[in-house]
Amino acid sequence: MGRSLKKGPFVDDHLMKKVEVQEASEKKQVIKTWSRRSTIFPNFIGLTIAVYDGRKHVPVYVTEDMVGHKLGEFAPTRTYKGHGADDKKTRR
């Protein structure tokens, strides 16, 4: 279920300030954030945002296709190690 259109998209204020400072500066640095709930805006394009996955910050390079999605969608929180191998040989 999506967010109501009358409310508009959500971005944490501290993240938006960091993005505005980054746009004003010449250097491109990685922006660290814990805000997985923030929506990606068009002015984020071309920036690298390190999104926290509960263990480490995952660098996410923002492209045009990502606009409108949440930052947390691009930093998975669970690592899938695969199912166990078939143990028929070891059971004998």
Curated annotation (Swiss-Prot):
Gene transcribed to yield this protein: rpsS
The keyword RNA-binding belongs to this UniProt entry's keyword annotation: yes
GO cellular component terms, A-Z: cytoplasm; small ribosomal subunit
Reported function: Protein S19 forms a complex with S13 that binds strongly to the 16S ribosomal RNA.
Protein name from the UniProt record: Small ribosomal subunit protein uS19
Listed InterPro entries: Ribosomal_uS19, Ribosomal_uS19_bac-type, Ribosomal_uS19_CS, Ribosomal_uS19_SF
NCBIfam families with a match to the protein in the record: rpsS_bact
One MF annotation (Gene Ontology) recorded for this entry: rRNA binding
Taxonomic source organism: Lysinibacillus sphaericus (strain C3-41)
